[in-house]
Amino acid sequence: MAPWSHPSAQLQPVGGDAVSPALMVLLCLGLSLGPRTHVQAGNLSKATLWAEPGSVISRGNSVTIRCQGTLEAQEYRLVKEGSPEPWDTQNPLEPKNKARFSIPSMTEHHAGRYRCYYYSPAGWSEPSDPLELVVTGFYNKPTLSALPSPVVTSGENVTLQCGSRLRFDRFILTEEGDHKLSWTLDSQLTPSGQFQALFPVGPVTPSHRWMLRCYGSRRHILQVWSEPSDLLEIPVSGAADNLSPSQNKSDSGTASHLQDYAVENLIRMGMAGLILVVLGILIFQDWHSQRSPQAAAGR
């Protein structure tokens, strides 16, 4: 077997002349940079990152962080913002397009912003979108109330006041249920010495069930929240008043018509019963009148 030699050593121009030094340098640079450029141009899709059962976790509860890449992934890394080293490294789970990172007991040290990467033969992927992992239960709960009234008419707006005597830098309003929406506002100091935020919500409708809580947090660790406020449910009144006059007139007319129809049926049934009674009496009298002569003849 012939000994291996660099491909550039076998390149000779037509005519047998030696390759110029400048051309040799360019060829060597092209050969050395070629594979590297191919890897960089691979454009690996970025990883996908999420948390189960969710990204807002009560203090002491467990959470699982999942990172998804491609089937060619050989390694997954979880990186926490502000940390110089990877938070954790995991081998992929079958079928190799996912990895699992577990936190058995959530603390303030786990709260923060995370991203993940995966490694494949083509190189490292792009980072995932950030995941905000929040821990709750580190401060006393704020209060949540509706202004100007806890009962809201359908179609109106309502202002939700989240407040506390504690010096929170911001308040977070969250919606319970399937929607799980959230809003964040900086806190304001009131003349009474309370910190609060006013959240405008609406217009509200009876078709949407409004159940909300709020939290407080401080600026140095924004992902560490207080205990949740008591649940606030907003009753929406005036649903029947939203009917148009034509609808109300139509409904009342229909009800009146049904009532008249029922009375007519009762009268007809009464008349039919009376006729049956009269017929019964007439038949009995006829039968009795025919029997009397027969009885007299028998004597």
UniProtKB/Swiss-Prot annotation:
Residues of the signal peptide: 1-41
Biological processes, Gene Ontology terms: cytokine-mediated signaling pathway; immune response-regulating signaling pathway; innate immune response; negative regulation of interleukin-12 production; negative regulation of interleukin-13 production; positive regulation of calcium ion transport; positive regulation of cell activation; positive regulation of inflammatory response
One Gene Ontology cellular component: extracellular space
Residue ranges of the TM segments: 269-289
Keyword RNA-binding: no
Tissue expression profile of the protein: Expressed mostly in tissues of the hematopoietic system, including bone marrow, spleen, lymph node and peripheral leukocytes. Among leukocytes, monocytes and neutrophils express the highest level. Expressed in CD14+ monocytes, but not in T-cells, B-cells or natural killer (NK) cells (at protein level).
Presence of the UniProt keyword Transit peptide in the record: no
Glycosylation sites: N43, N157, N248
UniProt topology in membrane: Single-pass type I membrane protein
Coiled coil: none
Residue intervals of the Ig-like C2-type domain: 51-136, 142-230
Extracellular compartment residues: 42-268
Disulfide topology: C67-C116, C162-C214
Domain of life: Eukaryota
Cytoplasmic topology ranges: 290-299
Assigned keywords, A-Z: Cell membrane, Disulfide bond, Glycoprotein, Immunity, Immunoglobulin domain, Innate immunity, Membrane, Receptor, Repeat, Secreted, Signal, Transmembrane, Transmembrane helix
Pfam family, one: Ig_2
Subcellular location: Cell membrane
Cited function: May play a role in triggering innate immune responses. Does not seem to play a role for any class I MHC antigen recognition.
Name of the protein in its database record: Leukocyte immunoglobulin-like receptor subfamily A member 5
Upper taxonomic lineage: Eukaryota, Metazoa, Chordata, Craniata, Vertebrata
